[in-house]
């Protein structure tokens, strides 16, 4: 499992859910929406570790 996603705070989890719901409302499949948000979270986490 992805440690980046496992270490999210409750607030970050809620934000991710909201982003996924917005993408689904725009017509993106739930699986694709989850993949998009997960990648965004990984990218954000990676950038913060590079600092």
Curated annotation (Swiss-Prot):
One Pfam family, short name: UPF0181
Question: Coiled-coil annotation: which residues?
Answer: none
Fetch the InterPro entries from UniProt.
Answer: UPF0181
Q: Which family does it belong to?
A: Belongs to the UPF0181 family.
Question: Could you tell me what this protein is called?
Answer: UPF0181 protein HAPS_0710
């Amino acid at each position: 499992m992805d440690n980046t996603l496992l270490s999210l705070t409750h607030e970050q989890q809620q934000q991710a859910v909201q982003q996924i719901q917005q993408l689904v409302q725009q017509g993106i499949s739930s699986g694709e929406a989850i993949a998009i948000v997960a990648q965004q979270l990984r990218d954000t986490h990676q950038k913060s570790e590079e600092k």
